[in-house]
Amino acid sequence: MPYMLVRHRVKKYATWKRAFDEDAEARKAAGCLGGQLFRNHDDPEDVMVLLAWDSADKARAFSRSTPVRDVMDAAGVIGVPSIVFLGDTERVEV
């Protein structure tokens, strides 16, 4: 399964989270299957988003789209996000 890992700083987490939640239907329509949010323990404005996609090509296209960039800007994303595309390799136990 393809994943997209996004890491960025935000001005205010609550503002960013509201914008992220409001964009859920756009993500779903683009092929996103859901995911998980993470915050840095030492810096709660450092946010990581791991999203599963039905195709890597759709994830890449979504990440490059103007509407996504506009949402990020309005949500208070600081600077250029780090975006990495991942493939599911192996699940490991303790």
Segments (PLM) and residue ranges:
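Short, well-ordered beta-strand segments in beta-rich or mixed alpha/beta enzyme
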Residues: 2-9, 36-65
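Residues that cap or initiate secondary-structure elements
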Residues: 12-14, 55-57, 89
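Short amphipathic alpha-helical segments
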Residues: 12-34, 67-71
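Residue-level detection of beta-strand scaffold positions
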Residues: 16, 24-25, 49-51, 85
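Glycine-rich beta-strand-turn "strand-cap" elements at beta-sheet edges
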Residues: 30-46, 70-94
